[in-house]
Amino acid sequence: MSTDQMTQLDESQIETNYDKVVYEFDDMNLNEKLLRGVFGYGFNKPSAIQQRAIMPIIEGNDVLAQAQSGTGKTGTFSIAALQRIDPAIKAPQALMLAPTRELALQIQKVVMALGFHMDIKVHACIGGTSFVEDAEGLRDAQIVVGTPGRVFDNIQRRKFKVDNIKMFILDEADEMLSTGFKEQIYQIFTMLPPTTQVVLLSATMPRDVLEVTAKFMQNPVRILVKKDELTLEGIKQFYVNVEEEQFKYDCLTDLYDSISVTQAVIFCNTRRKVEELTQRLTADNFTVSSIYSDLPQQERDTIMKEFRSGSSRILISTDLLARGIDVQQVSLVINYDLPTNKENYIHRIGRGGRFGRKGVAINFIVNEDVQALRELEQFYSTQIEELPSDIGTLFT
């Protein structure tokens, strides 16, 4: 079947040119030790993307999968990579790239958990560690998870031998290609063996992603979630028009008095706004953490650890966090500022409803944002309703 001949699967709003669907992990012919790891991790039944994407990746096809955070995509490529590598070969065989250090570490954690019973090593090739540590880890790790800059540096320094690489996986490709990594990613492609299988995962399909597909992928299997399904199911979306910027803070504190949730993430567009909001909330006796890209790495790690453990109730962030960090307890996301980039909206609100967990997203807007809100609705074919007065019922 040609890549242009798409079969639409109505039951889950997925379009694909690959007609095999495997509904159970037991039917995927997975390595017995890997299967133990899959069930041990808590995966009982494959998600829609896993039912359709794991097998073509295992079969060695180039695969282009469009799926947002929370669909099980990390499990998809992790399971497939673990099935494809040879544990007896103590050298890198699969390279996974992610746009941020945090997401790379999250992926490493998932791969290690799934491969717990296998004799494999997973190395995180990321900033904030020494090149000596990298050289040591890269020597005998079968799977390398990293950020583009650090991976490229290590290949250039000849510390990362890519001769045995047979899989190149790009997660959140739209984000990586739009944030200055494009040149490095292209150069990494040219350094890998020409037979390398390419797996590309992206929430959206902008021109940059399609260019990579055309240049570096051979007749890819395409598994595309229809765009109007990309607004995460199970997320209730609302807006509050506070009219002017100065009224956002009072609205936030009023809201928080009215609802009882375990934890919340609040997104702002700038570091300065994050710092100001953190100071005001702290002064008003709210337990708050904040994170942004300029923070020292050790501090960022500590803050994320505290938030995951539940010792901090509110996390205020820039879009650094808007991609793929799995914080299980979050049921509320507040966009203190509407994102400047439409694509980031889905990653922000996805924080509250991963894998079918329910969540609420509340967008604060001023009068000038009304048009931008309507454009978001149009972009995602969704409805963002005015927040009702009885908001406490949203969390019951």
UniProtKB/Swiss-Prot annotation:
SMART domains, per the entry: DEXDc, HELICc
Ranges spanned by the short sequence motif DEAD box, renumbered to the chain: 171-174
EC category: hydrolase
Protein's UniProt name: ATP-dependent RNA helicase eIF4A
Function field: ATP-dependent RNA helicase which is a subunit of the eIF4F complex involved in cap recognition and is required for mRNA binding to ribosome. In the current model of translation initiation, eIF4A unwinds RNA secondary structures in the 5'-UTR of mRNAs which is necessary to allow efficient binding of the small ribosomal subunit, and subsequent scanning for the initiator codon.
Protein family (similarity comment): Belongs to the DEAD box helicase family. eIF4A subfamily.
Subunit structure: Component of the eIF4F complex, which composition varies with external and internal environmental conditions. It is composed of at least eIF4A, eIF4E and eIF4G.
Localization terms from the record: Cytoplasm
Residue ranges of domain Helicase C-terminal in the record: 234-395
SUPFAM superfamilies named among the record's database cross-references: P-loop containing nucleoside triphosphate hydrolases
